[in-house]
Amino acid sequence: MTITPIRRHVEPSYAVLRPLLGSQATVLASVLDGGGHVPLTLECLSTPVAWGGAVTYSLRVTGPSEQRLVPGRYELMHPDCTFLLSLFAVAEELRFVHYEAYLSEPL
């Protein structure tokens, strides 16, 4: 019998994401991606910019090139929490694909 740990679902925010940098999360890839769990490293959080009543920033995550994700919305499962992000590939190397999620929060 397999027991799945219960993780708290959180809304991604700068305050929530900052402590998670450098850690790993996984996503469940869709059938279009080939299926399976894909490990992602939360790599970089940009400096937030305040404009038009909102703060905007981006989160860069890195995954293996042999398990490339199609652009879309994914649930990232971190050991401490889960959250939804829209991921888009922005760069590809021999071994890794870099994805970015663009986020905004009201001031």
Say what each PLM segment does.
Residues M1-L107:
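Surface-exposed, beta-sheet-biased, low-hydrophobicity segments with strongly acidic/polar composition
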